[in-house]
Amino acid sequence: WKGYRLPQYDIDAVRENTHKAPTWLHFGAGNLFRAFPAVLAQRLLTAGLSDTGIICCDGYDEELIDRCYRACDHLSLVVTLYSNGTINKEVVASVTESLKLSEDMLRLTDIFLAPSLQMISFTLTEKGYIIQDDTREFLPDYKHDRENGPEGCQSFFGKLTALCLERCRAGLSPLALVSLDNCSDNGTRLERAVRHMARAWQRGGFITEDEYYFLLKKNTFPLSMIDKITPHPDNRIADKLAADGLENAKPFVTEKGTHAAVYVNSESPHYLLIENAFPNGHPALEQCGVIITRRDIVEKSAMMKVSTCMNPMDTALGVFGCMLGYTRISDEMKDAELVNLITRLSEQEAMPMVADPGVIDPEAFLHEVLGERYPNPFLQDSPQRTATDTSRKIAPRFGTTLYAYYNSMLPAHRATKLIYIPLVLAGWLRYLEGVDDNGSEFTLSPDPNIEHVRALMGNPKLGDDVSEAQLYPLLANRYYFCLLYTS
């Protein structure tokens, strides 16, 4: 284990304590969870600030539970990649148990009925909170649960709401349900999914008004802002780890399309702010760098990142990188035109409308993104990853800034003067053709709405003369563009 940082606590004792008196349950067993929340829990254990770890559960890609957790005795290897080429390797043992939502409802019920339980966190990805299709019809499994009540739920949010209901009926303290997903208003999205389910049950006579009140008003849904680039596992890192003697280091892709490995690789910079709304207490996260603060500060921090200082550039580098044949974000940062695009997009158009949270300096944050994080050659992030699910990201990443320009009274801040934001939006439409700048077809990144948005555009081909009228059905579609498009 030379060169590896090992757990500095009694792993067996932590597992026993957590099984008997769990405090933290997490849904979503992917790479971000292993690289960030699990490491935070390890820091608390190492410092003696906690004697329990995290129990994780996955309901989307349960193959991860078998291959990344149970096969490794719930030990995970976290590799931190610094811009100077330094690599830090740490064995993380804070995850004490892993569960499958489809098989382990009895164990999950036991956990929810533990008086010690304080918080439930989530990394579901942005699309994980979607409960309705583009016609506002509820998705089939969600609709089934709304109509049939808490027994025999099929959907993730049906099962989650039913578990919270069990805790309510046992007379136990409410919980904080904390979304740690990289999207705006993440806590509100989580609350909305639970509210739609609980209201349907209340109206259908399955639960009482008091139970509905507990689910939505006693439980809390704090907002958070999370930031830590965690790309797919890198084969170069796998080779280094295999040379150290790590078995089965080669990355794999699950049947659901998740890129995973027995290790995770991520960058060093990280940020996490959580709204201070914990009805039953919380782990001492503030002792390891997490900012627990007012809701408005979290909102401004999230808006700063999602709408100004990072996520819009993610989209720009994603769609243009795919069309230009790049496979690494760090290589894109050697392209003067792309650097010019994201620099002007952020500094000239986004920053004038930035929300300043007061606890993070937007200028310093942006400088770190442009000068250190994106150019990091050892962090093999790809435009193909950042272009994933772009149809879900256009409105939150560009809408806030565009609204600010539309509402501005200053002549210098007119939406009609914008250049780079419209260019990125146009770039996404061009990307949807699936043809690069050499005229060769490329595979579009996963996005549940690809076929629909292409159909709304009329499926144009490279070189076609596309009119505004042809694009109008997509640009005017509120599901994708909210109110971004005006004639």
PLM segments and residue spans:
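Substrate/ligand-engaging "lid" and interaction regions
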Residues: 1-27, 31-487
